Amino acid sequence: MQQFQQDNQYFIFNFDRTFEQATEFFQAEFWQKQERVIGSAKGRGTTYFLQTEDWFGVNCALRHYYRGGLWGKLNKDRYRFSALETTRSFAEFHLLQRLYEAGLPVPKPIAARIQKGKLGICYQADILTEKIENAQDLTALLQTQTLPKETWRQIGRLIRKLHDLQICHTDLNAHNILLQQAEQGQKCWLLDFDKCGEKSGDFWKVQNLNRLKRSFEKEVGRMNIQFTEQNWADLMAAYHQ
């Protein structure tokens, strides 16, 4: 792992070397000129999927950090700087690395960057993570099919592993769970660990699970996904095993 600075930019890479063109790796225009953009997804901003397996060992997802809500309309992507390790991209990078090393199915962090403003008070942030191949989020799948009992149980076990590490996923919802079609069968992945972190005690775990259930119930009405109380019961049974 290598951490370094170039002018007003700070980088961390999951490699034991620096890169002269490090800035370009976080610019969508660079990858477009290289004809290496293989897809994109819309959220708060655009996540670009990149053909980088020959460079980084895996294909990547490039994401810029944007604010949401009313504040985001006034200040779309600048955050107050206090310490490098607590910046949005560096914090998510380190958390993903911790979970990846613990064996949880999360994207491997590849690199992160922050760029300070002229006064050094604020910064903008970007992150490169592993692209999970042959995968869709649960809401997309559940619009067209039901999922087997074992898949719901797998989700329950995954969340339990996360909670046993005392990690609170602050945006745990159906869109942040991917289902991958792998050789060994279906595999669940967790995404988007921005603003997530360690939390003591157990009181928040039920709230976290309730948040996930509400997200499924919301998408039943909004996207007509196929989700039942029995699905949730299967998930919870595995969680409590």
Swiss-Prot record:
Presence of the UniProt keyword Kinase in the record: yes
Swiss-Prot/TrEMBL keywords: ATP-binding, Cell inner membrane, Cell membrane, Kinase, Lipopolysaccharide biosynthesis, Membrane, Nucleotide-binding, Transferase
GO cellular component: plasma membrane
Membrane topology according to the record: Peripheral membrane protein
Top-level enzyme category: transferase
GO MF annotation: an example: ATP binding
Pathway: Bacterial outer membrane biogenesis; LPS core biosynthesis
Major subcellular location class: membrane
Subcellular location: Cell inner membrane
Catalytic activity: an alpha-Kdo-(2->6)-lipid IVA + ATP = a 4-O-phospho-alpha-Kdo-(2->6)-lipid IVA + ADP + H(+)
Enzyme nomenclature, EC number: 2.7.1.166
Pfam families hit by this protein: Kdo
Superkingdom of the source species: Bacteria
Active site: 171
BP-aspect Gene Ontology terms: lipopolysaccharide core region biosynthetic process
Family statement drawn from the similarity comment of this UniProt entry: Belongs to the protein kinase superfamily. KdkA/RfaP family.
HAMAP family, A to Z: KDO_kinase
Job description of the protein: Catalyzes the ATP-dependent phosphorylation of the 3-deoxy-D-manno-octulosonic acid (Kdo) residue in Kdo-lipid IV(A) at the 4-OH position.
Protein name (record): 3-deoxy-D-manno-octulosonic acid kinase
